[in-house]
Amino acid sequence: MTPAELKRLYHIIKVQLEYGLDELMPEHQLTKAPLLARKSLFWLKNKHQDKELGHRLRLALQELGPVWIKFGQMMSTRRDLFPPHIADQLALLQDQVAPFDGQLAKRDMEKALGGRLDNWFTDFDIEPLASASIAQVHTAKLKESGREIVLKVIRPDIRPVIDADLKLMHRMARIVAKSLPEARRLKPVEVVHEYEKTLLDELDLRREAANAIQLRRNFEGSEELYVPEVIPDLSSETLMVSERIYGIQVSDIETLEANGTNMKLLAERGVTVFFTQVFRDSFFHADMHPGNVFVNPENPDNPQWIGLDCGIVGTLNSEDKRYLAENLLAFFNRDYRKVAELHVDSGWVPHDTNVNDFEFAIRMVCEPIFAKPLGEISFGHVLLNLFNTARRFNMEVQPQLVLLQKTLLYVEGLGRQLYPQLDLWATAKPFLETWMMNQVGPQAVINAVKERAPFWAEKLPELPELLYDSLRQGKAMNHRMDQLYQGYRDSKRQQATGKFLFGVGATLVVCSAILVSSPYEQLSMGCGIAGVTFWLLSWRAYRR
């Protein structure tokens, strides 16, 4: 390790000990190393003993900086790994850090654009509108049209910091996996690898721009969701230019109510938008926390969601969508047998899973949920309980389902914050039933025919020629098969002849050896010559 890496590692361990995070290790697995480090090397005590462990973990991650804050945010969605009191504290982590110098931001923007800002913009505000761990946002106007826009620029020199911390994370994950057998189930190395991929994706603003363009296209003209327009000609890997929007933050309940917003419709539309993204588009915004969601104030009776920051998105293939919809419908119909069978059929759990045991486990975990009124059941926690139970039966971590679960928890939490009486199931069930009908009913056949019709129309003129070629190739194949079979029969016949000649030759050689000391020397010589001759003939038969 380099001196810089050792210094950073020292700081990380120091912060962990100051916040008493060694308590996260099971007592029977607590080795002498943390105790020795605390007492003899650092002389550090837990300075926050009055705070609950989850609170201490959150404060420690905040002190360690942006890379660790975002790691904690990701871990808050993995409620299969942490108890609720820790996951709830991690969910409170805010990706807000002190802004960096606006002149540095301007320098990097001009570098990305290849020229001075005033070639494209006017009224550039050197003071940032918002600042986060990865990027910072400034406002300006387009020079040609006067349209208000925002410029999002990656923090300067952030990549070396991220690379250094990720390297340390990987080393620490390997140490934890090796030294703590109980931690291997949590797959710390795989968790860090998943986080690294997500974080590095956020460093390329071209990816976020492409996601925003796709999401905007999916909801073009929609009254339910608006996505600000990206200006791709001015965007690059380190700079994204997009339309500026004015809205009310979705968590600002007081302002929304003062504006006369229809809170019930707003909450229900959040659910509709989510399921539309998942099941209609197979492409969903996977970072729908309150900081990324605003409400259009212009028409409060018909409120419209505004989605920002499309850096993290999720996708589902058609099989996953179908199994997910069937799972949810079966669960709310309390058909646990079907839920278990669907998990096996989808490959989410191994095919040799005992379905009876799996059904019983699901029933034991999920049946108590129905003790509550249907409107109070948490859709997100339904998925959480299902996936946690499935993991006991060796369900592999499905990244796309983890993102889906996280997003559903966000949407459900926002919806019930806006309208506590929100019955998410009543809103979602008709959508799921209609979608399933379109997938497996007569309409599904019609849709499939419509989808494939252009392809078959293109291939129709070629069908006679393709049919003729197939028949000709089939005839040639039959002739070739006859030749191969005849060759096989000839080969077997030659092998049989060779074996016979070899046996006769061997017999004659043995007779020659027996007769060599007898009065019949000439007969012995004749047998020997004949035996060698038969051997040569058998060798020739094998060679053919």
From Swiss-Prot:
Arranged from A to Z, the UniProt key words for this protein are:
ATP-binding, Cell inner membrane, Cell membrane, Kinase, Membrane, Nucleotide-binding, Transferase, Transmembrane, Transmembrane helix, Ubiquinone biosynthesis
Which sites bind ATP? L129, A130, S131, A132, S133, I134, A135, Q136, V137, K152
Q: Which family does it belong to?
A: Belongs to the ABC1 family. UbiB subfamily.
Q: Which InterPro entries match?
A: ABC1_dom, Kinase-like_dom_sf, UbiB, UbiB_bact, UbiB_kinase
GO cellular component terms, alphabetically, are:
plasma membrane
Signal peptide from the UniProt entry: none
**Name recorded for this polypeptide:** Probable protein kinase UbiB
The entry's function note states: Is probably a protein kinase regulator of UbiI activity which is involved in aerobic coenzyme Q (ubiquinone) biosynthesis.
Q: Which domain of life is it from?
A: Bacteria
Q: Name one GO biological process term.
A: regulation of ubiquinone biosynthetic process
Q: What is the lineage of its organism?
A: Bacteria, Pseudomonadati, Pseudomonadota, Gammaproteobacteria, Vibrionales
Q: Name one GO molecular function term.
A: protein kinase activity
Location comes to: Cell inner membrane
**Pathway participation:** Cofactor biosynthesis; ubiquinone biosynthesis [regulation]
Q: Which CDD domains match?
A: UbiB
Gene name per UniProt: ubiB
The active site consists of: D287
Q: What is its EC number?
A: 2.7.-.-
**The Protein kinase domain, residue ranges:** 123-501
Instruction: Quote the HAMAP family the UniProt record gives.
Output: UbiB
The membrane spanning regions, by residue number, are 500-520
The way this protein sits in the membrane is described as: Single-pass membrane protein
Name the species this protein comes from: Vibrio atlanticus (strain LGP32) (Vibrio splendidus (strain Mel32))
